[in-house]
Amino acid sequence: MKKLILSAALLAASLASQAQQGPLWMRYPAISPDGSTIAFAYKGDLYCVPAQGGEARQLTTNAAYDSQPIWSPDGKKIAFTSNREGSLDVYVISTKGGAPTRLTTNSGKETPIAFKDNDHVLFSANIMPTAQSNLFAANEFSQVYEVSTEGGRPKLYSVLPMENISINKNGQVLYHDKKGYEDAWRKHHTSPITRDIWMLDNGKYQKLTTFKGEDRNPVWAADNQSFYYLSEQDGSFNIYRRNIASGKDTQITQQKKNPIRFLTSSDNGLLCYGFDGEIYTVKEGGQPQKVNISITTDNDEPSLIRKVQSWGATEIALSPDAKEVAFVMHGDVYVTSTEYKTTKRITDTPQQERNLSFAPDGRSLVY
């Protein structure tokens, strides 16, 4: 009887622990202008949750991949990107839910950056760069366009790449630039092409940061004289506040191990961001608070996906006796026989394996 009670207690503790853990890898959190609600992407759909935490409400249910929610200034609409028509397009949906409206129809990739006002969305795309541009027309160096929330023909807003745009009530624009092809998820990057923050005010561009590493993701503070942003100046991405006139920084967070991503701010100064797969809020001078979120939804993804691929190997190495071939697929190492239909997976890691070669005896691999 005691063993039965103990087993039941352990089971209950285990279930409670799992419930407390909550969902992980919720991405692109965006806090509403009034600071009451957070929109985020999870497993290809959009959700909304109270800023203090609780049960998340599913906003989109399409089988396609929906991501990168952006709030309108009045908090009534959310723009997002989705590949439900093949390529990534910009859509807008009521915060109450319902059927979204498709705003872009180009065959390329369009992602929303900000609302210019309640009725116009700014988005990045490669549609019609001007002949005067000295930038190569590539996806990595997209332009910025604006489109009505009712749809219609897009209008060129900026030929320069402008990412993570934040517009205050005076019409001043903050953004971070893009100078090269470096992966946006790379950490500890220092080079001449790292991102810097700029301000566009009445047609004049002003560079606001000069750190040799990454400065990115600016959002206006409530006073319109300073802004919050992410920087790696202390070794990991943390939140800073910078006064534009003095250039003085105030560090808001002190994370050391993992980077902070996806910074947004409400009109009342509540900051929201992603950290280590979860969502946090913080006010200047306070301590970060994890937003405890529960999601109740059907599991529409199979636990195991069988894929047969005849292409996509990034590297290949032939054994000394020519009876085996090693190759890299999706970052992992595989070995296949040249005489039989046998393929064996050698590695299963979240890291990327590369530079394959067989040992002289053909019995081991170096990578």
Give, region by region, the residue ranges found by the protein language model.
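Positively charged n-region of N-terminal signal peptides that target proteins for export
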Residues: 1-4
